[in-house]
Amino acid sequence: MNTTIRPAGGLCLPDKCRVTLLALGDVGSTLLMGLRLLGGDVIRSIGICDVRPGVSERWEFELNQIQSPDAAFLPPVDIIAPEQLFDGDVFLFCASRMVPDTSVTSGDVRMAQYGLNRELAAIYARMAREKNYRGLFCVVSDPVDPLCRAAMRESGLAPAQVRGFGLGVMHARALYYARRDGRFASYLTEGRAFGPHGEDLVLANSVAHYDDALSRELTDKVAHANLEMRRLGYKPYVAPALSSGALSLLALLRGQWHYSSVYDGQVFM
């Protein structure tokens, strides 16, 4: 029997979804690995698309050679053309026209990408509209929340169809600091992340015993953790791709509690 789940707003998805993913850069390829390894219970297959020659072929070749000794089901990966991106149930937008180099170690790196990435998101949002798409349009590229709004406006999709995946890593980073600094330990069991992914993030050290000073300090650490990684000379993409991307998306498909951005009538947050 093909049962359905309802992630939001009455939107129905099959018990095992066809997922399509655009762009296999650092984030997209890492997210893809997470879905292939962990998503066998809720994903039936994954279609991948990248405009760069040889990139899709590389990841189809690599990912389909991953298999556990017990031959457990892992979602097969296949290569698709851009016009096939909206033939599935869940579309993942991981594309970016500009990712700041690791030499950029200050400022709002996420919003710096908005102009060019908005144009790119608009192209695929219009494609979704032309295809009369009925599935989920999931934004993973930065800046997540503004791109969600742009995608919804350009596509005419229902608000329940558009989701942003950026807050999961903020929660995960808060847990990281809470484990390392006892002052933030309450976050481990009582903390919550609110607001958009980026500079306007708000972390509550505890929803039961809120401390404004501690919450503000933790928020500042988490909001700028990406810059700490850049100072080490690396782009911060592994934790976002898995915490915000793969793990949060799989939780949504399983009907479980998770962090993702939804539309409140004015903004995505």
List the model feature ranges, each with a label:
Residues R180-M269:
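Long, compositionally biased stretches enriched for glycine and/or charged residues
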Residues M1-R58:
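NAD(P)+-binding Rossmann beta1-loop-alpha1 motif at the extreme N-terminus of oxidoreductases
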Residues D26, T30, G54, G115-E119, ...:
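Conserved active-site and cofactor/substrate-binding residues in soluble primary-metabolism enzymes
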